[in-house]
Amino acid sequence: VSYNGLWKLLIDKNMKKMALVENENIGISSSTLAKMSKGETVSMSILEKICLELDCDFGDIISIDKSKV
């Protein structure tokens, strides 16, 4: 899994990764953020919260890294 779309979106919105942890509407833990930074999977509910808060779709923030399949 690749979250490169999310990282790019955060840059475009002038936000840091820690904003995902600090934002009460998203409310992810620092360990979840670490998992995402390593390209590990997280729950759909987390992705949904991120999309709702950043006003985007799943495809904007996550993609399949076919080189790792």
Model-predicted segments: where are they?
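A short, Lys/Arg-rich alpha-helix, primarily the initiator
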Residues: 1-18
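The alpha-helix within a helix-turn-helix
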Residues: 10, 21-23, 51
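Short, basic-rich loop-to-helix N-cap that marks the start of a DNA-contacting helix
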Residues: 39-52
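Residues that mark the N-terminal boundary/hinge immediately upstream of a DNA-recognition element
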Residues: 16, 43-46, 57
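Residue-level recognition of specific faces of alpha-helices
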Residues: 32-35, 46, 60
